């Protein structure tokens, strides 16, 4: 099919078509309107399979390789779109802080790289290299097809088996990434940027995504520490501070196949750098010193239950949840164990997990300050 046929045909049926990529996966999805379980669903499967198994990737859409410092390139194609996105993201202060932190959290693992790539690579990669990557990794063993909705299961399974015929394509080579261990000393990375305020990020390596109970425990800790205006960081660093030091203070937990990331971050006044670092560090250490309360634990559990329920409200969310557990955790049964594990977690469990993963000596601290 010609470029654009897939999108135009399905969008004419009322479908939403998109794709996304992250550290462990890329996913392509089609969401059809209710009532499209018959021929429209069959058409979507046919076109989706055609796109996944036999992409054309025309040279004229990718664009010819070019030198980055050549101002005469006027034929802007897909590679130029990606490069512009890289440049836009690179100018964002939080992206700078995160990239510096992430790069120094890993010694060898590919997670240290930026997912979107670099302008140097994107400007030079050839169509042959892209097709070779596709032929190597878009294989039966590496792909999961998920269909959620109200349809005849047996008929749709038969349709998927028919359309997704890889015609003997070999499976992708098994990749065994060397798992990095946390640093045994605090690493501080400092940089300058065009900003009026300063940015701070503490980064910690966590458990693998399929270590379900520890992951839920870190989700709970993230909520207690810094995920809302009632969190410890917001209350202690913003709401109750006698002088304004912080504009933002929060915590986030990202889950990855080979090991998660836990971030504690803040945006603060440049002249208060030492004080800001000390206060954020104190909040992390106080997860042990100032014991988590039953009230904090129950409130966080309630919030996680709501998220879990919300993830089952639409076909898109159900599909994404199944895809995550199939691809990143490699164990669909973990969905069934989730709420049971959540209910079993105690304050003592949280203390053990905090001591194990949120030790300041294992942190990478990234700081971005204004240029003088």
Language model features: what each stretch is:
Residues 38, 99-143, 175-179, 208-210, ...:
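Histidine-acidic residue clusters that define the catalytic metal-binding segment
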Residues 107, 115, 120, 139-209, ...:
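An aromatic/glycine/proline-enriched structural segment found at the starts
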Residues 5-133, 282, 297-316:
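Acidic/histidine-enriched segments that form metal/cofactor-coordinating
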Residues 10, 28, 48, 82, ...:
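Buried hydrophobic packing residues in well-ordered domains
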Residues 1-10, 202, 212-225, 234-237:
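Active/ligand-binding-proximal structured segments within catalytic/core domains
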Residues 67, 73-74, 79, 127-163, ...:
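Non-catalytic, conformational "gating/processing" segments within enzyme and secreted inhibitor domains
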Residues 144-147, 291, 295-372:
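C-terminal regions of mature proteins
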Residues 16, 201-205, 225-267:
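A structural supersecondary motif
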